[in-house]
Curated annotation (Swiss-Prot):
Tissue specificity remark: Expressed by the venom gland.
TM annotation in the entry: none
Residue positions, PTM Threonine amide: 66
Entry superkingdom: Eukaryota
Keywords of the record: Amidation, Disulfide bond, Ion channel impairing toxin, Neurotoxin, Secreted, Toxin, Voltage-gated sodium channel impairing toxin
Record-stated family: Belongs to the long (4 C-C) scorpion toxin superfamily. Sodium channel inhibitor family. Beta subfamily.
Protein name: Beta-toxin Cll1m
Molecular function, one GO term: sodium channel inhibitor activity
Organism: Centruroides limpidus
Function recorded in the entry: Beta toxins bind voltage-independently at site-4 of sodium channels (Nav) and shift the voltage of activation toward more negative potentials thereby affecting sodium channel activation and promoting spontaneous and repetitive firing.
Subcellular location, record wording: Secreted
């Protein structure tokens, strides 16, 4: 599974500005989804890869970014 890492309290994606390989996104993806996750900056949001199937990613149902 892949997807944008999401802030569960705000419903917003984690923003990034350095597209492609991005240490911040990689670190955040691993922190939220585990050591096996990968991450990079895509379309100014942190995109996480190699997630477990039940991982919660953006957009959150019934919660828009505030």
């Amino acid at each position: 599974k892949e997807g944008y890492i999401v802030n569960l309290s705000t419903g917003c994606k984690y923003e990034c500005y350095k597209l492609g390989d991005n240490d911040y996104c990689l670190r955040e993806c691993k922190q939220q989804y585990g050591k096996g996750a990968g991450g990079y900056c895509y379309a100014f949001g942190c995109w996480c890869t190699h997630l477990y199937e039940q991982a919660v990613v953006w957009p959150l149902p019934k919660k828009t970014c505030t």
